[in-house]
C-alpha cells in the first residue's frame, strides 16, 4: 500500500495517494481490533486468577498477600463467592463452580481434603485451604501456558499460506513493472496512465485477505475451546481433528469413572473395621474406595499395634489378616474356596475386584453415538478382562473392542490403522496410554489423567467428558469450513479486481476499499468461531 501511495504521488495523484493511506490506516485499525479479539483468551483466562490471597498465620491473623508468595503448606481463607487463589485441599465439604476450568456452570461438591483448583469459585460458605502447589504449578497456570503455546504454533494450512505468500509477493513485484511496460509499449497508453494502473494492480494483487484466511479463525477456535475446557496444542491439532476416521478409546477415566466404588460386600462390622484399618495404609484405588465406603465406621476398638505390610502386587497384610487379590492366598491349602472362607468368617479376608466394576459416564453414550453418526469408528482398547470389556462396550454402544491390552498392543492397533491410510485418534488418561497417544495422528488426553498422558497428547479435555471431544470435533469441522470459505472468497476478490483493472474499470481508492474490505470480512468471518456453540 505504501508503494502504491508513493507511486500515486510521483504521477501527481496526491489526493488519491492521501485517500489511499487514509483508507488503509482505517482498515488497519479495524483489522488489528478484530484480530486482537481472537487472542484475548489469555487475558480472559488470567482474569479468573485472584492476584492476592488471605493467608492465615500461625497466630490466626489473616494477611492479604500476593498469590505468587504462597508456598506449600500455607493456610488460606476462601470466603463465599470468592475465586480460589491457588490449588489446595479444602478443610471441609465445599461447593465449587469450576466453569472457568471445564466450561460447566453446575457446581461440583468437593469432600474434605479433596483438591480444589485456582480460578474456580467458592459457591458455599467460607473454608480454609491448605496450599498444595505454587502459583506457577497450578492446573490453571498450566492451562494458560498451554493456550499461550498453542497460539504461537501455526497450523499446517497457515504455514502453507505463508510459504505461498512469500513467492506470490515476489511474483507481484516483478509482474507489476511488466504490466506497466505492456500497457505503455503495446496498448499505446501514456506513461502516467500506465503507471497509475500499475499502482492499482499492486494494490489489488496484494494477498492480505488470503494471508488472514486461516490464522484469526484458528486462534478464535483455540480460544473457544479453552473457554469450554478443551485445550489444543496448536493450530495443527485444531485442524486435524476433523479429519479423524477412527477413534481408539481407553476405558477407565475415559468411558468409565476412574474411581472404584464398592457395590457389594459380605462381612460383619468387626471384619470391615479390620479391612478399613489395613486399607488406610494403601494408596491403591480399590483400597481408597473401601476406605471411602466405610469412612463412618468407628475404628477406635481396632488393635493397631501390629504393623501393616504390603504384599507386593497382591495386597496388604496385618498379622494373620490378608486383604488382596486371589494370588495373595496362594499359600492356603484350599485356594478354590476363598469366598467360602469369607462367608465362614475366617480371619483371612478376600477383597475382590469383581464387585467394584466402575460406572460409565452418561456423556460417553451420547458421544459414541454422535461419533458413529459422523461415520467415525469408535473402538475400545482396555487392559481389563473380556467380561468387563464386553460389559462396558455394550453399555456405551461400542461394537468393536479388545480386552487385556498392554501399552504395546494399543500402539500396534494405532499403527495398523495408519498403515491402512486412516487418520487415527486415540483418547486415554493413563501412563499406559501415553505411547499410543504419541503414535496416533491426534492424541487426546483426559484432564484428570497422568501428566505423561497429557504431555504426549495434542488435545486435552479438562473435564472427563467425552461429549467435549465431540464438541471439539465439530468445532474443528467448522474451522476448516470457514478457512476454506475465506480462501475461496479472498482469491475470488483478487481475481475480480485484477480483471477490472486490466480493463481499466478500477481507480485507486476503490481498489483499496475493496481490497481492505475483503481482508476485514475474512477476519470477521473467522471471529465467528469465538461465539460458536
State the predicted function of each range.
Residues 159-191, 197-207, 212-215, 484-516:
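Bilayer-spanning, highly hydrophobic alpha-helical transmembrane segments
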Residues 1-50, 104-193, 479:
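Actuator/coupling domain of P-type ATPases
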Residues 127-133, 347-349, 379, 452, ...:
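A short beta-strand structural signal in non-transmembrane regions
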Residues 44-129, 133-134, 236-275:
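Conserved cytosolic catalytic loops of P-type ATPases
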Amino acid at each position: 500500500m505504501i508503494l502504491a501511495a508513493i507511486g500515486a504521488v510521483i504521477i501527481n495523484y496526491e489526493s488519491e495517494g492521501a485517500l489511499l493511506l487514509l483508507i488503509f490506516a482505517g482498515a488497519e485499525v479495524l483489522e488489528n481490533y478484530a484480530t486482537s479479539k481472537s487472542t484475548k483468551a489469555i487475558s480472559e483466562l488470567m482474569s479468573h486468577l485472584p492476584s492476592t490471597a488471605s493467608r492465615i498465620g500461625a497466630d490466626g491473623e489473616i494477611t492479604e498477600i500476593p498469590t505468587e508468595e504462597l508456598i506449600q503448606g500455607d493456610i488460606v481463607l476462601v470466603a463465599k463467592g470468592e475465586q480460589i487463589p491457588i490449588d489446595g485441599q479444602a478443610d471441609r465439604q465445599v461447593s465449587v463452580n469450576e466453569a472457568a476450568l471445564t466450561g460447566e456452570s453446575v457446581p461440583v461438591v468437593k469432600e474434605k481434603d479433596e483438591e480444589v483448583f485456582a480460578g474456580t469459585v467458592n459457591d458455599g460458605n467460607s473454608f480454609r485451604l491448605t496450599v498444595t502447589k505454587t502459583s506457577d504449578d497450578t492446573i490453571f497456570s498450566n492451562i494458560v501456558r498451554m493456550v499461550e503455546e498453542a497460539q504461537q504454533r501455526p497450523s499446517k494450512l497457515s504455514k502453507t499460506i505463508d510459504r505461498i505468500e512469500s513467492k506470490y509477493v515476489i511474483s507481484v513485484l516483478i509482474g507489476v513493472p511488466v504490466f506497466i511496460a505492456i500497457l505503455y509499449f503495446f496498448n499505446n497508453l501514456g506513461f502516467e496512465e500506465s503507471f497509475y494502473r500499475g499502482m492499482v494492480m499492486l494494490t489489488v494483487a496484494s494477498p492480505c485477505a488470503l494471508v488472514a484466511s486461516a490464522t484469526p479463525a484458528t486462534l478464535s477456535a483455540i480460544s473457544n475451546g479453552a473457554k469450554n475446557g478443551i485445550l489444543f496444542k496448536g493450530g495443527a491439532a485444531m485442524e486435524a481433528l476433523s479429519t479423524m476416521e477412527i477413534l481408539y478409546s481407553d476405558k477407565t477415566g475415559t468411558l468409565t469413572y476412574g474411581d472404584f466404588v464398592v457395590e457389594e460386600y459380605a462381612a460383619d462390622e468387626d471384619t470391615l473395621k479390620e479391612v478399613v484399618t489395613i486399607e488406610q495404609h494403601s494408596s491403591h484405588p480399590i483400597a481408597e474406595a473401601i476406605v471411602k465406603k466405610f469412612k463412618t465406621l468407628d475404628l477406635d476398638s481396632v488393635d493397631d499395634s501390629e504393623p501393616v505390610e504390603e504384599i507386593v502386587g497382591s495386597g496388604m497384610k496385618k498379622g494373620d489378616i490378608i486383604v488382596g487379590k486371589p494370588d495373595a492366598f496362594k499359600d492356603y491349602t484350599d485356594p478354590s474356596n476363598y469366598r467360602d472362607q469369607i462367608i465362614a468368617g475366617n480371619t483371612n479376608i478376600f477383597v475382590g475386584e469383581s464387585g467394584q466394576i466402575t460406572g460409565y459416564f452418561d456423556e460417553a453414550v451420547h458421544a459414541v453415538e454422535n461419533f458413529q453418526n459422523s461415520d467415525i469408528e469408535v473402538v475400545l482398547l482396555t487392559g481389563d478382562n473380556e467380561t468387563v470389556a464386553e460389559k462396558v462396550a455394550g453399555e456405551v454402544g461400542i461394537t468393536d473392542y479388545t480386552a487385556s491390552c498392554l501399552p504395546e498392543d494399543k500402539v500396534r492397533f494405532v499403527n495398523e490403522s495408519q498403515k491402512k491410510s486412516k487418520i487415527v485418534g486415540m483418547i486415554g488418561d493413563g501412563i499406559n496410554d501415553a505411547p499410543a497417544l504419541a503414535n496416533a495422528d491426534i492424541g487426546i488426553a483426559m484432564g484428570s489423567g497422568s501428566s505423561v498422558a497429557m504431555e504426549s497428547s495434542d488435545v486435552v479435555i479438562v473435564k472427563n467428558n467425552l461429549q467435549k471431544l465431540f464438541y471439539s470435533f465439530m468445532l474443528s469441522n467448522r474451522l476448516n469450513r470457514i478457512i476454506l470459505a475465506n480462501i475461496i472468497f479472498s482469491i475470488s476478490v483478487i481475481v475480480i479486481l485484477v480483471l477490472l483493472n486490466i480493463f481499466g474499470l478500477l481507480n485507486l481508492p476503490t481498489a483499496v476499499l475493496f481490497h481492505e474490505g475483503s481482508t476485514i470480512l475474512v477476519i470477521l468471518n473467522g471471529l465467528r468461531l469465538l461465539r460458536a456453540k
